[in-house]
Amino acid sequence: MVTKTNNYPSLVKEIRKQLDLSQEDLARELGVSFATVNRWENGQVRPSKLAKAQINAFCSKTVGEGRLKLSGLWR
C-alpha cells in the first residue's frame, strides 16, 4: 500500500490529523517513542526501514477500516 515519499513530516502530520491522534498516541500505535514521532514531524530524522514498515502496516490497517484516506499523500 505505502509506496515512497520524501516528505515524512507532512505524511506523519496528515496521518495524525485524519485519525485525530496525538504524537504520543501515534507513537504507541507504531511501537516507537513520542520523541521519535516528534523528530519525524520536525524533519530532524527520517524513519528507519523498520519504522517505514510499521507506518506501512498501520496505514494499511486504518485504510482497511475506512479511517484513513491516503490519496495525495504518496508519490
Where do the protein language model's features map onto the residues?
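Short amphipathic recognition helices of helix-turn-helix/homeodomain-type DNA-binding modules
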Residues: 67-75
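A short, Lys/Arg-rich alpha-helix, primarily the initiator
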Residues: 1-18, 56
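Short alpha-helical DNA-recognition segment
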Residues: 20-38
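DNA major-groove recognition helix of helix-turn-helix/homeodomain DNA-binding modules
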Residues: 49-68
